[in-house]
Amino acid sequence: MATPGYDYDRDIPAGFYDEIHQCKAGVRFFWHDLKFRAVAKRLDGVGKVLDVGCGPGTFIGNYLGGVECLGIDFSASQIDYANRRYGTAEHRFSTQMLASLGERFDAITMIELLEHLPPADARRLLAEARGLLSPQGRLVVTTPNYRSLWPLIEWGVNRVSRVSYEQQHINKYWRGRLAADLAQAGYAKVEVGTAVGLAPFAAVFGRGPAQWLDAVERSVGHLGCGNLLVAVARP
């Protein structure tokens, strides 16, 4: 399941997003850091996590210490990178497909994945993941919120970045549509919120301003208009 006409192994080098994270500063770092923190917060207390579309392993390696994790991705080069940098007995990375795992998980994450898939493939993936959750498990999904400032941000990124979201993002969600797809996939309890407002852009002035603005935005729940949707769904 890949974006038609887009070659991830060719256009996104192994470790590309992890190298952004290693900088620990700047707009792009804070964007991904706030996103990962929003997901990790929703995994509090879980015992075993599957990260679908894990890329170079940044989320597992930096935010899920002490948690048994498996990260999977179709890109062999990204998985090779993840194993070299973050692989341990506790943190495993593989190119296995969902159907071949044969394991149950307390939580499954899909971080910035669904927007890259054709709608039918995305719905099928959500349904397959439900079958791998433990009875009390949870699925945590993030995807851009196309009823926020995200379309404007995406337009700008497409003109200054080596990565073209115009080519990558073929499946566009808003709160109601994501909730509907999760319900259609068989999830009984679905909550969709938002995260990541304008705080990352304050990072041009330093870490302090970005952290301050993030605290303000979180205190008002991003007014429901954060640039990312964050859904928690239970089987």
Summary of predicted features, one role per range:
Residues 29, 154-158, 180, 190-235:
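A C-terminal cap/extension of S-adenosyl-L-methionine-dependent methyltransferases
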Residues 58-61, 148-151, 199-202:
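Short catalytic/ligand-binding loop motif for oxyanion handling, primarily in non-cytosolic enzymes
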Residues 115-117:
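A short His-aromatic
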Residues 123-135:
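A short glycine-rich, Lys/Arg-flanked "PGG" loop and its adjoining helix->strand segment in the class I
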Residues 161-177:
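Acceptor-substrate binding/catalytic loop of class I
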